[in-house]
């Protein structure tokens, strides 16, 4: 799987929970209960393994492109059976906060994909110094917590900074709304919904109307006003993987032999006559 990930230039390794349970059942259970303790170490080990399998120059390009964080260069996406953590938006309760969940529903709204700054680079002409600043928000899985959101414009002596936009690192960011399926909602009640935060390679994977399974970490975000909070938290799902429901039903599965035959037919001069005889041979 890792070799295939490198060949396809993908950034996310799918991990089936069934395989993880077969290897270590306690590890799989702890992953669902405390994903913040396991996801980043998983990704760091994955990056270290890929580093030994890739060309050093190519790997360094990936490090520079992602801002240099070893545990965020390559991600893991979980799938399989989630047991009691497999719910609908109506089943999301406080007991599932900070746990790995799988939520089924219909995508009703998808925001535009916007870049989110991960690292900014600033240059001061007066002092000839370069300053780097990394940013983490409440969506980050890091245990270090969110950083300040203040964007530096001048140094401690009042000298202005010039932002080097070409050296800054950005990450794609999108918010989608997942609503309960009509057949799953109790009769006479409105369907519930939940916001899902998608970043990196997960953006633009779904569109409104798609029936999907969203796998991610159920997080509570505190809203503050004048340094105070009401105690009511907004909850979102930090996306880890996206799986389509029923997308491959009735779809055409192409084998390498089929592709070879199609290319052979495409080289023939009488392809239109052949196609007409194949479509209506009895007329």
Model regions and ranges:
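Long, low-complexity, serine/threonine- and charged-residue-rich intrinsically disordered N-terminal tails
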Residues: 1-210, 215, 220-227, 231, ...
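Dynamic helix-loop-helix/coil hinge segments at AAA+ ATPase domain boundaries and subdomain interfaces
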Residues: 89-93, 249, 256-283
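Interdomain "pre-motor" coupling segment immediately N-terminal to P-loop NTPase/helicase cores
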Residues: 211-267
